[in-house]
């Protein structure tokens, strides 16, 4: 499974624990970190945010939206998905540890839907999310912008 991590500015020190946890639990894990800072971990790919940012993403970054940091994450994840030509990926906050491989959870996720942790009925958080279609992020971006 593809795992995408997003680090807006600097890469937090604790992310190495999260990455090691994923690699030890999910033998099929492919780890990609999206950040402007290079990460030097074995078996981890880095995508430079400024290099993959589309015009839509840059517009969000230059906007006056209150939640532009959270919204930018969604846009960057979509940029990374396209850059890497991924059909699906798992994404969660950098301080989340997982204890099961994706293969043992995949049956609970719905196809062509936003599979994401809900804080409430009105608010979503990236505690754990599974994106299984480019269209899911396109629709979400259209609602946001």
Summary of predicted features, one role per range:
Residues 1-8, 97-145:
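Glycogenin-like
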Residues 39-41, 64, 77, 126-131:
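Low-complexity, flexible helical/coil segments
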Residues 14, 65-72:
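A short, glycine-/small-residue-rich helix N-cap motif at loop->alpha-helix starts
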Residues 1-61, 82, 134-135:
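N-terminal anchoring/stem segment of glycosyltransferases
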């Amino acid at each position: 499974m593809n795992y995408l991590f997003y680090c807006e500015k600097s890469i937090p020190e604790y992310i190495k624990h999260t990455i090691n946890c994923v690699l030890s639990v999910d033998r099929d894990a492919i780890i990609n970190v999206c950040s402007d800072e290079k990460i030097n971990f074995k078996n981890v790919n880095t995508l430079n945010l400024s290099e993959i940012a589309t015009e839509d993403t840059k517009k969000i970054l230059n906007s006056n939206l209150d939640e532009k940091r959270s919204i930018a994450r969604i846009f960057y994840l979509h940029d990374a998905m396209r850059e890497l030509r991924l059909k699906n990926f798992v994404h969660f906050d950098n301080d989340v540890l997982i204890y099961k491989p994706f293969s043992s959870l995949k049956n609970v996720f719905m196809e062509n839907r936003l599979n994401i942790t809900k804080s409430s009925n009105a608010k979503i958080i990236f505690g754990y999310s599974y994106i299984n279609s480019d269209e899911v992020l396109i629709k979400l971006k259209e609602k946001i912008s």
